[in-house]
């Protein structure tokens, strides 16, 4: 997650449990972030072993300042934790609704959720994708509803044909949008309710124990 813009990229690493190797994390960051955005000035991570070793060595060699947060102090990367939590909430809903199973389906699902959160989240009136690229990203026909794509009949046919991979991806995206609205609204309602939290008015009695 880019702290300034809120731009978020989640990367599929592998199937199974356990901590991934630092080389896997390095390759993922190089392919999915550095390849198009360049090396960041600073990287702040938790204290997981996957964020050390080769990862730190190579990033430091590229002039990146790598910092680990304190022990048991996830609040130091609170924005990253909140974004990650919302992403997982959206993914869980899509996986449950669309019965996503297997490595190939997860690999198709991940970029669709990335696109949705970077398009629909707002920071200063603009989406993270707009802050980073300077424009609204161009998506598949039928997504933006503009005249430029209205004549793309083949793409629209692919969209409604359940046997195509394209239709599968569009179903993931549509479900992810619904899940994002639900998760984002729930978060905003919770913030509004807790913003000025105070005890409920009432006749409270205080008990004294003189024993």
Task: Name each region found by the language model.
Residues 35-54, 70:
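Acidic/histidine-rich, metal-coordinating catalytic segments
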Residues 10-37, 48:
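Active-site beta-loop-alpha junctions of metal-dependent nucleic acid enzymes
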Residues 4-8:
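Short, glycine-anchored, charge-dense loop/turn motifs used at functional sites
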Residues 56-211:
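Domain-scale segment recognizer with a strong primary affinity
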């Amino acid at each position: 997650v880019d702290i300034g813009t809120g731009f978020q990229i989640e990367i599929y690493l592998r199937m199974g449990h356990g901590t991934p190797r630092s080389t896997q994390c390095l390759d993922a960051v190089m392919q999915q972030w550095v390849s198009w955005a360049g090396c960041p000035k600073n990287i702040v991570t938790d204290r997981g072993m996957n964020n050390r070793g080769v990862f730190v060595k190579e990033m430091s060699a590229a002039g990146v300042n790598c910092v680990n947060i304190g022990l048991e102090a996830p609040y130091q990367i609170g924005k990253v934790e909140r974004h990650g939590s919302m992403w997982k909430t959206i993914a869980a809903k899509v996986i449950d609704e669309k019965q996503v199973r297997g490595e190939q389906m997860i690999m198709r699902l991940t970029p669709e959720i990335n696109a949705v959160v970077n398009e629909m989240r707002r920071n200063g009136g603009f989406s993270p994708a707009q802050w980073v690229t300077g424009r609204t990203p161009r998506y598949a026909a039928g997504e933006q509803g503009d005249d430029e794509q209205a004549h793309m009949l083949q793409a629209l046919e692919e969209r409604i044909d359940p046997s195509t991979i394209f239709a599968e991806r569009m179903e993931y995206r549509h479900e992810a949008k619904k899940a994002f609205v639900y998760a984002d609204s729930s978060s905003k309602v919770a913030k509004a309710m807790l913003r000025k939290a105070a005890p409920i008015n009432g006749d409270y009695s205080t008990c004294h124990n003189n024993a």
